[in-house]
Amino acid sequence: MTPEARLAERVRRDLELLSYPEREWLTPRTTRDGQPILDVLIVGAGQSGLSAAFGLMRERIRNLLVVDQNPLDRAGPWLSFARMRTLRTPKYLTGPDLGIPSLTPRSWYEALHGEGSWERLGLIPKETWAEYLSFYRRTLGIPVRPETRAGALRYDPAERAWQVPLEEAGDTQLAFARRVVLATGIEGSGNWHVPEWISNALPPDRYAHTRHDIDFGSLRGRRVAVLGAGASAFDNAATALEHGAREVRLYFRRKSLVNVNAYRWAEFVGFLKHLGDLGDAEKWRFISQILQMGQLPPADTFRRASEHDGFHLHPGSAWKSLAMDGERISIETESGRHEADFVIVGTGFVTDLKLRPELEALEPHIARWADRYTPPAAERHADLGRHPYLGPNFEFTERTPGEAPYLSTLYNYTFGGLLSLGFGGASISGMKYSNPRLIHGITGSLFREDCEAHYQSLCAFAAEEF
């Protein structure tokens, strides 16, 4: 038996010891024409979707399914567009394990690499994290249907369930689910953003977003301009240089790089667990301040790029315009004019539920923060205003009261929950607290919906003990 197999047995034994209460408590339901109705459908099989499934399974919700558009165990960025070498989160994180010591990343890593290996490890390599998530899925028996894309959701009041088109290999089938969890990651409440003034000015083969597939080999000997100073901008700059780019110039608006990490400040129980318990004004003040402080590149990421002679920083250099000048890209910045052969856009993502195909029919009914709260002028932030205004357990709320009450059975466990509930929807660091909050909401919602049936079950209970 391999060390990983022995650890998997230990995990299952630990779960058996903690399995009370074991009785199944949800009655299977079908549609009027006999099609099974899932208790929960989870869209997204990355770390958030898998941990949500595990949390529900521990609460005896087993009639569930996780779908993901990617191949099995390739959900999330780790084996695709993530170009960092390691996670940015410190290795001592916990969260997906849900309090099971044998299921922690440390237990798994030490089982594979031996005693003392954890102490020698700095940050967790991204490929190692992907391997851990695969072990997690296999050990827990989480039902995942890969290469399956969820279409536009619609609520069916007659069935008291969501209709979800699931497309797989060109074939679309309609699934029904009492509850749906969207665990679609950082872009799950919007999409990656390339400003129109860039996409309108350049041919498609002359620019890419950090999220895009990039043929870095084609950049050998070329001049690359990177817009943005976040971690992913530095990751892509370093990758281009490692593939032989002649030079990479990184441009950003601030007068100097951010070198204080507000996310490290936030790593304490009060903020991670209880931001969602604050009032709207306090939530807005905290999150807008974190965003205003900015995102820095981790020290290792900065060194990875700056060790190359061809790497140049341009602070105070917001881009004013750009255009093709023959075969060259001409860039006008606040610090002067520059030229490049290729542009990498590191401007992150935009929050806008209108960009989510699965919410196409629902977006007009979903409450946003701009519908519920007006911040002081000094704290105004357009992107925050577009964040969904979520309930206490990541559920959507209705924009007009009474118009779409069914939205309370649809959960947004994505980065879009940042303003309402803090880190957690797509963040490893907040998962320890966000997962129980989500699971509590779903189990409570299902129990309330079935309350009368449970009461009738109690009245009919007649198991004599002597």
Label every PLM stretch briefly:
Residues 1-70, 75, 118-243, 249-466:
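Flavin (primarily FAD) cofactor-binding/catalytic cores of flavoenzymes
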Residues 48-51, 79-80, 94-95:
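Generic N-terminal leader segments that precede the first folded domain
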Residues 84-115, 264-278:
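Flavin (FAD/FMN) cofactor-binding and adjacent substrate-gating region
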Residues 73-83:
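Core mature regions of organelle-targeted
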